[in-house]
Amino acid sequence: MTPLAPWDPKYEAKAGPRPVWGANCSSGASFSGRTLCHPSFWPLYEAASGRGLRPVAPATGHWNGQQAPPDAGFPVVCCEDVFLSDPLLPRGQRVPLYLSKAPQQMMGSLKLLPPPPIMSARVLPRPSPSRGPSTAWLSGPELIALTGLLQMSQGEPRPSSSAVGPPDHTSDPPSPCGSPSSSQGADLSLPQTPDTHCP
């Protein structure tokens, strides 16, 4: 039976001694059920286990597949064991973190080099004071439409294309009910009858 990877939902950690660096990286060992043992947390794991911090394995030379000394105390970690999680991915899927060095060489600095972010904050360039405020984001028709919308929301009368001035409220003809009609809010295109507009 093939051992399950630590990120597999069916993976269960076995109680017992923790494995150390060895030739077989596919053992899937972890400190807890499905928690990744990130190299930056190794000192914490060592302290929590009551054994105290052990000196870091020497970073000189390359790991040649032989088992580390029994007192090294580092868990088995492969490149596949180092990943980032994404809450938008389906459960159990991970984003692999490609290491710049083999995991064994990463122990010396206890730092990982994560990939560059997909989205990063970028400050928009500030307009130069000599040019004034920039309106390059909107085209001419967009500016006209936006100006019209702002005027409508503030209740200002719309400029008409003809040369007719604003409506004169004093010269409105009296309504059939005897009171002066208001040109604001009334639809002049509909015929007014005494049945529908009188109180």
UniProtKB/Swiss-Prot annotation:
Keyword Transcription: yes
Any one Gene Ontology BP term: regulation of DNA-templated transcription
Entry keyword annotation includes Cell membrane: no
Pfam families: SAP25 (PF15476)
Polar residues composition-biased segments: 151-163, 184-199
Protein purpose: Involved in the transcriptional repression mediated by the mSIN3A but not the N-CoR corepressor complex.
Protein name per UniProt: Histone deacetylase complex subunit SAP25
Organism per entry: Homo sapiens
Record gene name: SAP25
